[in-house]
């Protein structure tokens, strides 16, 4: 997953970074705003575990 794909997923679904943070917290995972910002800007690559988490979040399982 590239940062452009991530941006598009947020736009298409109407979900926000805050929604992702709340969703992760419900699963017992702490996520920082800065991490998502770096992913969205392309300053930090999106590793496979992050990509899976984002895909799971956007898929609404």
Stretches with model-predicted labels:
Residues 3, 8, 43-51:
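Extended, non-core accessory segments
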Residues 26-45:
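Recognition helix of helix-turn-helix/homeodomain-like DNA-binding domains
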Residues 1-24:
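A short, Lys/Arg-rich alpha-helix, primarily the initiator
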Residues 48-61:
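DNA major-groove recognition helix of helix-turn-helix/homeodomain DNA-binding modules
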Residues 17, 33, 51:
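Helix-turn-helix DNA-binding elements, focusing on the entry/boundary residues of the two helices
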